[in-house]
């Protein structure tokens, strides 16, 4: 019994001891569970933003986000003070006139900075060169840059090392800093007058994009633009009420610019280079403005790599490569070997041809564009070039066929066929790429290069084997027009095949480096000083005035008359033989054959226009301004007039060389248009300028007398039998008016009085006065000279009218007389 009670008490005590802990155990474990698995922390605003459904991001460090219709930028604090460039290029286009790869933005450069609440984009302004520490300190205190954009800070990233802002307006198609279609071709006639207005509801952000130093967005945009036509003299016809639509996909990026790798290289008038402005500050001399050359950071340690589109066949690739690398010898002369390296597009997946910092040569399937185009990308605030895009359109081949056919086919049989041999075609590709690449390197065209050598030298195989055919490939010359049949076989160079002596000098000046502490300006002057021959001459092109006749388009050799004769010889040979050369039935209705007569006619006009630049021509260099001799000016006027008025079509050319319309014959077309197309009226102002500033001894009044004698010769003789000669008198009257504001005003008044009974003054580009580079003070007497010439024309027309008996011709003469009287203010 006692044992039983003891056992029961022992069991109860054990239960009492164990029960509290067993009952409390689950509560404690539940509390412990809550402690071990706490509620997840709330997301930060940045985390909510960056993980939002549907948001897309691209880039590392510098990032871009697409959030529906918004674009956000994430900018690390470490980039503050860095420079970026905002740019847009065409990626796809509905118009063949807006090519892929074309830049459609002004490439604005900005400096990144930040306040407590804003991300700021500042304009860097002009390059500043500071000559002493005193000015450096002063500018450091006063150097506040103008603000272009300010974006409120919206988020900080996870480790607070970057800020995020809503940058939608920066990438917006409405932002003129990002998009500008001004000047873009709408078709083969019209161009865009304005920057373009995005079409509502036709814009879409497709995706964010990123490259090693760039981020941005690809977007589909439709623009409305106002078309315009150039009208000469800086004027234009703008059709503001009419809107043309351009659709496309565009890539807009901000690119982080590297640290500037070049120094200021102030321009020199003896070397033509692309340039940007700079300001120099000195406590002794104050502020001075200048221009510094645009150039690449090319040195012994840094090369320029160029990638070529894989769409080009192998033969074209080799021609492109050789054309670009033809510039390497100029760099080797200053100690830089293989400065330019050309490669095919790499096959590895990381290569992106659309990267703004990739230099490339692209194929373009645009069949209507004919010229190679280049676009430079760089830091416009320092002048450093960072990349380029060269585009070769499909239409380039057709242009090559025409150029070769009418320039040299009679001398080189390879070009007498539509389907020329690939080797001949690639010679031209190489030459044209070599020419275009001079501009890529920062050189301006030097049209004086083609005038460095004499016709005798250009006919010499031994000379051309050593020197080529031009002193600068930046000139527009392509073929040696002095070549005759068989010359190529005996070793004469017939096409541009190497850079010239001026080109080598220009590269030496532009890319030479000097030890630290060198007075660079003096060193560069000494680089140029030894080179004084004609082959080193640089003459800038000054618009359509051509202020120095040694820098003209379409010329070759230092004898302008011989150049004209050779161009005409080639053209006549083509006309005589074209039918047999391209008589294949498959070409019967081809565009090549149909357009050939028009192309040939335009080449005749281009040849005479180049020669006529010597009328009123001057030589303008370090020794001052000198005029082309008066006798030679008069001789050129007579020569061109006689050529066109006596021109007759070769009998073998009659089946091919004819036109449809009012003037169907080739010689009729010439008589109707030669005075206008040769530039007789456009040279009036330069004749006046040369007489005033270069003492030519050939005043405008005398030139107008000579011109009137030539153009009214048949009417003065009573021979008004060819109706296609009447427009010459009409153009004479209009040409005089284009150089006389007084007569223009009188004519317009008469037009309004007659309620349109006579034609309004035509805004013809070829007749419009070209004012660029000609001081108005030089033309003070020109109005009176033109008025007196019009009086003489009126008198000639009145005399012809009294002698004419044909009623139809009387009506034409009366019409011409009405125009002259209206211009003279006669009622």
Question: What is each of the regions a protein language model found here?
Answer:
Residues 9-17:
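Bacterial N-terminal signal peptides
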Residues 449-827:
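Conserved catalytic/binding loops enriched for acidic/polar residues
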Residues 28-312, 318-321, 330, 334, ...:
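Auxiliary tRNA-acceptor-end handling modules of aminoacyl-tRNA synthetases
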Residues 345-367, 427-484:
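The catalytic-center signature of Zn2+-dependent metalloproteases
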